[in-house]
Structure formats: C-alpha cells, structure tokens
Amino acid sequence: MAAESGFWFKLKHMDRGMLVKKMLSFDNVYVIAVRRIADGKTLPEDKDREFVQITDTRDFWYADPSLFEWKGDTWLFVEAFDRKTLLGGIACCKLCDDPAEDVKKLRVVIKENFHMSFPQVFEWNGGLYMIPETGDDHSLILYRAVDFPDKWERVVRIQTESVLADTAVVKKESGRLTLLTSELSTKRQYFQRYHRMYLTDKGNGRWELTDDEEFLSKQEFSYIARNAGSLYEEGGQIMLPTQESTETVYGVRLNFVRYDENEADIFAQRTGSIGPEDVTVRGFGKGRASGGRLDGVHSYARSRDYEVIDLYYNEFTPLKHFRKIAKKLKY
C-alpha cells in the first residue's frame, strides 16, 4: 500500500485542536530555558525547580541547545532560526552569573544558504570542532574553529544519500570519530532509525564516512530513534537524551537512556522520561495539560553547572504558509 502523504496523514491522525491551529496559521515557536544545577539534582528527577527562558527576538527564535566547557567557561551553542528566511544558523554565547542576561549576547557564528541546527562542539586532536545538523543540504559537515568561538572553517563536507539528523559524537579516536545519527524516513514524517557511523581522516585532505552495518541491521524505524542532545556523565554512567515524536507531532517528550557502545538497542537501559507537563518555565508555566502554554519538550543539554532544555508552543503566524511557499520557490 502506498504511504499517505504528510498532509493527508496529519489531517487523518492529528489531534483536532492542534489541527485547527495549524490550518489557522499557528506554528511552533521554540523556547530555550536554563537553570543552574543545585545540590546535584537534575532532570528527569528534579521537576520542581523553575527554568528561566532565553528570550527570543524579532529576528530569531532559538532551539537545539548544547553546552561546551572550555578553559573554565561554559558556552551555549544553539540553532538561531531566522524568522524571515525560515533557515537556521548557529549562534553562541558564554554563560556567566546571570544566564537570562548572558543570552542577550547570542550572536550567529555560522550561516549557510541551507538550514542548520543541533550544533555539537567538541575538542579533538588538539583542536575545537563542530558537527551541526545539515540534513537540509543532504550532507554531513565537519567544521574547525579558527578563532573560537566566532570563526569556523569547513574541514570536510560529505554528501549523504539519506537525510541525517541530530548527529552526536559518541567516541573520539586520533583519526576517527564515531557518530550516532538518525536517518529520516522518506515514507512517513517523524519516522527515523539510528545509524552508527565512522568519520575517518584518511590523510591528505581525504575523509571517509562509513556505516556500522552490523549495528544498522538491528535498527528499526520508530518515533523515538533520535538524539535530543550530547552524551553526558551521571554517577559514572554515560547518558544520552533522546526525543520522542508521535505520528503527527514532532518532539513532544524526552527519554533518558544509559548509553552502551556494545548494545545495539539504544533503549535497553531507559532511566526516565519527561514531557512539557513535567517542566516549569518562568512565564510559561507547565504543559497545556497542567494549565500552562507549552506543547512539547524537544532537547536537553547538561554541563557541570547548568541544565538547558528547549520546548515549544504554538504562535499565530499569519504569513506562515506564504513564507514556506516562498522558501521552496527560492531554494
């Protein structure tokens, strides 16, 4: 049987209230929120302490936060979504004493003519590197910092047959990176499956991206097989946040799993899960089911001192459909 198109599938299966909003030009707007870690208590257990919103601007809203610690400082990297072009770039700022004030210094550091998101920054081979999501370009791109954090150069761009989303670095060796990424289904929206891939420096400017075929043979498409942030350590365990969608709605919940490189089932050791009803953001409250404004929780990052999440709500956007058509015609 032929797969239903995205539009007709959503029309048939989406919650009626949400469907009406979408047809009336409501669109997702993402909110990044941050809080300091207190007494070692973090999500998914600590659901009571309030997060503080990182305010969006007239030109940008922000999503896909990641945290990178460097020389005693904590840097926040995000997707900066341009409301006019409908394309994301990569922005950053340093977190200090007052995150709500710090983020007013967010500035775009990488911008391409295609959509970018999910910036993953890491130290490797004596340098600082970044792999953002560039699935809109059907590529995987490795950048190197020339003047951290403001100037980056491309090291390599590898064309990919599939659209790869939300790539995380799970292992670093001297000449090779092990990546955990998701292939997006061409038949059903929000359906994806995990790939473990190796990005290898072959020398003399040559790079190779290969699949772990044994790992791939054990993966299935699902609504949960997608990263929601970088690996982090908790109590001697390596943890991975993942995002959960539904048939018709993207990024509604987060799952937390213990990551084991020898385990093909990423979700074999799931330790917790949260939705918008479990998180309080100043000015937004909790999820709509709890009387707040939030519709979904989508990403999570943690450092020694901070936790950062992104959530979304629906906002009336009268030019939504016009801008999407204009973007397709332009690109």
Q: What are the functions of these language-model segments?
A:
Residues 1-331:
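Carbohydrate-active catalytic/glycan-binding domains of CAZyme proteins
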